[in-house]
Amino acid sequence: MAYYDDGGNDSQPFGRAQGGIQGPRRPRLVTDYGSSMVQWMRNRRPKYQGGHRMETERPSASYMVDMLPPLARIHSPVDSIPVRHLHQSIGKSKKPITVVRWTPEGRRLLTGGHTGEFMLWNGTAFNFETVMDKGDVKYWRPNFNNVETIDDAHHDAVRDLAWSPSDTKFLSASDDTTLKIYDFTARTCDTVLTGHNWDVKSCDWHPTKGLLVSGSKDHQVKFWDPRTARCLTTLHSHKNTVTATKFSRVNNNLLATSSRDQTARVFDLRMMRDICILRGHEKPISTLTWHPVHCSLISTGSEDGSLYHYLLDEPNLPAGQIPTVAPYDSPDPANTPAQVIYPAHRIQYAHAATIWTLDWHPLGHILASGSKDNFTRFWSRARPGETSYLKDRFHIGEEAAEAQGTWSRNFGRRQMREEEEQELQDEADSLVDQRKTPGTGLPGIQSASQPDGLGSSLLPGIGAAQPPPPPGLSTSMAPPGNAFPPNPVFPAFPFAPPFSGAPPASGAQPMNSPNVNLAELQKQLAAQGITLPPGFPHHFTPVSTPLAGGGLPGLQGGYQPDNNYGR
């Protein structure tokens, strides 16, 4: 793995003259998680063959090549604590970052700014890729086409979104005191959840159950049934605004919440009570996140810019405090007070202002943080034998790091200018926000009018047109109208006929059209260096009988989305 190095020789970094930025640009280092995955896949063996537990890396730089992904250390969450700063990114607008989210495959990171625009960063080299305009709730495809916009989704700011397990619904939380459940394909509001008395700051959808949770400025945590829009129960454990509510994706029985009362709590859904209280922050906690692999590792961010990591199985009590008993270890778990947990690792100066958002890479080796100081920073675990991170400016502060010689303020300014230059160059080469022309489909994506419940004509890939009926089906059972989209073939050749999924009209001879000139087609292909096979026909043979049922089987999608709320 290659990581970004925040240290180095201050006198002449990377060949640049003192006090200037002329000379070769600093090489962009990347994080290559592929090497650790390959190492794990090559060395692991199933349990029935023995030797499935591999040798642990020793504290030496020579063991760097033996680093394994967090999945190989499921029972050792301490190895995945992100203690080392990798890189920091800042957008051209230089506005506070309110949300960061990794794409499901982990190749890119999406960040949302205070002005409403959002940016896309490369997840390996952390370079800027593209920027999007601000606006309302919008649907985007990976090719950066704005597919759809929901105007006036709420009457006030939308604070959080959460997806259903089937990805057909999503939940929104707003400062207008309501939560709304939207149908993704129909782009309509199905249910409005009311019950909070103040701004709703966070929400989440259980990964396997039909259960919703929300946190509000009224200090309450509420559970909801998405089918009936009924509030199931309310928790009153916090004494100030609830800033984050997150279900664990590893242990589905756990819920974590954070609040401005400087604490975070872990609830067990089976007992419907808190089992852990996370203390240690000196300012209100603004966000938290679960590790995607280890259910006992929680990271929290505070309004003073500190980043703390907690291990639920290690209390880490300060000296002089009496340890408390976990409810699980008590003979009376229902009445035992929640166990107090203190951080296993503290990054006191992670940001210069409030940390508003945290998100883990899907593999669990990189943590991204977004802050009011306009920076998006990336954190990772330490390499074998590495301890220098304990003396960097993020752990002991800029003044102390400068006094110890581990960081230079002048070098930091030059480094910032270099990064800004690189971001400007990346933006010049970035992808373009491709706006969809109103009333038109996306290039290469078929669209068609479809009956309700069969998908969406505006959201390609979500549902599809109804397939043609099989031969002998009664006309009363067939779908109304022709819902089969045109399917142009060879768009580069204007003389090729357009085909459709529907059968040809009675008496028509589409395969013997005078517009089809195979001789001309053969010349065009030969000019491009394409050799046709021997016996290539010079004209089409008329088809006496059209395909029964219309079109070719498999060309028309017949997938009907699952509109259930839960699994």
From Swiss-Prot:
One of its GO terms (cellular component) is mRNA cleavage and polyadenylation specificity factor complex. Residues 548-557 have a biased composition (Gly residues). InterPro entries: Pfs2-like (IPR045245), WD40/YVTN_repeat-like_dom_sf (IPR015943), WD40_repeat_dom_sf (IPR036322), WD40_rpt (IPR001680). Signal peptide: none annotated. Its main location: nucleus. The keyword Electron transport does not apply. Residues 418-430 have a biased composition (Acidic residues). It is found in: Nucleus. Required for 3'-end cleavage and polyadenylation of pre-mRNAs. Also involved in chromosome segregation where it has a role in chromosome attachment to the mitotic spindle. This is Polyadenylation factor subunit 2.
